[in-house]
A protein has these predicted regions:
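Amphipathic alpha-helical transducer elements in NTP-driven molecular machines
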Residues: 13-16, 42, 64-68, 107-115, ...
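Activity-critical C-terminal alpha-helical subdomain
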Residues: 85-134, 138
Length: 197
């Protein structure tokens, strides 16, 4: 079980149960859309963000992105990391039928997928020695436009193809994708990847 410094924020108790089997970390549940009307919980999350940092880990469906985007506006950006699980179609064991979009949520993810999502988000694993991070050239909106991933004909289809290739959720906007790409890679590596397509 991996020990993580940051507080992980998930949608519900089943997500929390899954994480408890994978990581040793403080996990806070939002209660789904109830967080929109819970000023005390948002204030609590702000305090946790200031003290330990937060990692937002919501489902990759539309509802998960509505909640994630609400939190992006309610919490200080510099204290919050975004962890994305891939779009994997299926049904959780406890459910009779798949969700509306047919995708597995956090609760249905395998431990290695959750750990990889947390690692890609920049989680601080307290049980490993930190290696100095190499300086990397960030990806900009101008780069996305130059590569045909934003602002042009067919850019949406190219973005979707790249998102699938990188195991990122299909609901990411161009700005959300830019944020995720900068967590995962740098300008040079992405340029190489796009040339290989």
């Amino acid at each position: 079980m991996r020990k993580i410094k940051e507080v992980i924020v998930v949608e519900g108790r089943y997500d929390q149960n899954t994480l408890a089997q994978v990581v040793d970390a403080t996990v806070v549940t939002l209660g789904g859309f109830a967080v929109f009307n819970d000023k005390e919980k948002v204030a609590f999350l702000r305090r946790l963000a200031a003290e330990r940092g937060l990692i937002v880990l919501t489902d990759s469906d539309g509802a998960g992105f509505v909640i994630r985007n609400y939190l992006k506006g309610a919490l200080p950006k510099e204290q919050v990391k975004q962890a994305y699980i891939p779009d994997i179609h299926g049904k959780e064991k406890r459910k009779r039928a798949p969700g509306k979009e047919g995708k597995l949520g956090v609760e249905g993810m395998k431990p290695e997928v959750i750990l990889e999502a947390l690692r890609r988000a920049g989680a601080t694993f307290l049980d490993e020695t930190a290696e100095p991070a190499a300086e990397k050239t960030p990806i900009t909106k101008a780069d996305l436009m130059e590569w045909g991933l934003a602002g042009g004909a067919g850019s949406s289809q190219r973005r979707q193809a790249l998102l699938r290739r990188l195991d990122l959720p299909e609901h990411l906007t161009a700005n959300g994708m830019l944020e995720a790409l900068n967590l995962l890679t740098d300008r040079e590596k992405l340029a190489e990847l796009l040339q290989d397509q």
